From Swiss-Prot:
Known tissue expression: Highly expressed in kidney, liver and epididymis. In the epididymis, it is mainly expressed in the proximal and distal sections of the corpus region. Weakly or not expressed in brain, lung, heart, spleen and testis.
Modified residues (N-acetylmethionine): M1
Protein name, as recorded: L-xylulose reductase
Membrane topology: Peripheral membrane protein
Subcellular localization, as worded in the UniProt entry: Membrane
Active site: Y149 (proton acceptor)
Gene Ontology cellular-component annotations: brush border; cytoplasmic microtubule; cytosol; extracellular exosome; microvillus; mitochondrion; nucleus; plasma membrane
EC number annotated for this UniProt entry: 1.1.1.10
List of residues that carry Phosphoserine: S46
Role according to the record: Catalyzes the NADPH-dependent reduction of several pentoses, tetroses, trioses, alpha-dicarbonyl compounds and L-xylulose. Participates in the uronate cycle of glucose metabolism. May play a role in the water absorption and cellular osmoregulation in the proximal renal tubules by producing xylitol, an osmolyte, thereby preventing osmolytic stress from occurring in the renal tubules.
Length: 244
């Protein structure tokens, strides 16, 4: 199915690894013009070699002022993928201020800031656009040791709906994708233990974790005009986890 993304300028955060990197690669293959944002210069350097022509931006999105400097003059952006996130997992009784602050700075506050920058540009140009927020199955189901992470993703789902409500009159669609575990470097850090993985897999009717391409395909669909009547949605890519 043709998604007609060629020539569109797309900003992707968390572009250095995992889902973000896969999204950049897929967008580049469609002919889209990609602005790839990561806090790790080495990841951006290797990504530029793989996808010549993309525009790399190295910034820590947890730093509001640095983000404003890096992206405030990024130029016209048609589509946005808010993928950057951290997963600092602690038992509830051991949650630290540092983990809480860092998690909400990157997983929620940065989404607001980057989306404001992109949406204001779209509105000023008088053109439609689309934003996809990468959330999680943890936004709607509790997982042990994920109290802060689950909270950031639950907040992100509601933010997605409010953004859709307020930006809809400007013809800007906003949706979320909610994947199950994906065995990226972040996923492996948490779920590589077979016993722990089994406890999660037992809650997934399809009995498997997601691949990066499963999530990327959902993101590209929501960016494209093929989903032109879809906004404010949370699209599960979780093998039926929410059905249980």
């Amino acid at each position: 199915m043709e998604l007609f993304l060629a020539g569109r300028r797309v900003l992707v955060t968390g572009a250095g690894k995992g889902i973000g990197r896969g999204t950049v690669q897929a967008l580049h293959a469609t002919g889209a013009r990609v602005v790839a944002v990561s806090r790790t210069q080495a990841d951006l350097d290797s990504l530029v070699r793989e996808c010549p022509g993309i525009e790399p931006v190295c910034v820590d999105l947890g730093d509001w002022e640095a983000t404003e400097r890096a992206l405030g003059s990024v130029g016209p952006v048609d589509l946005l993928v808010n993928n950057a996130a951290v997963a600092l997992l602690q038992p509830f009784l051991e949650v630290t201020k540092e983990a809480f602050d860092r998690s909400f700075e990157v997983n929620l506050r940065a989404v607001i800031q980057v989306s404001q920058i992109v949406a204001r540009g779209l509105i000023a140009r008088g053109v439609p656009g689309a934003i996809v927020n990468v959330s999680s199955q943890c936004s709607q189901r509790a997982v042990t040791n994920h109290s802060v992470y689950c909270s950031t993703k639950g907040a992100l789902d509601m933010l997605t709906k409010v953004m859709a409500l307020e930006l809809g009159p400007h013809k800007i669609r906003v949706n979320a994708v909610n994947p199950t575990v994906v065995m990226t470097s972040m996923g492996q850090a948490t779920w590589s233990d077979p016993h722990k993985a089994k406890t999660m897999l037992n809650r997934i009717p399809l009995g498997k974790f997601a691949e990066v391409e499963h999530v990327v395909n959902a993101i590209l669909f929501l960016l494209s005009d093929r989903s032109g009547m879809t906004t404010g949605s949370t699209l599960p890519v979780e093998g039926g986890f929410w059905a249980c």
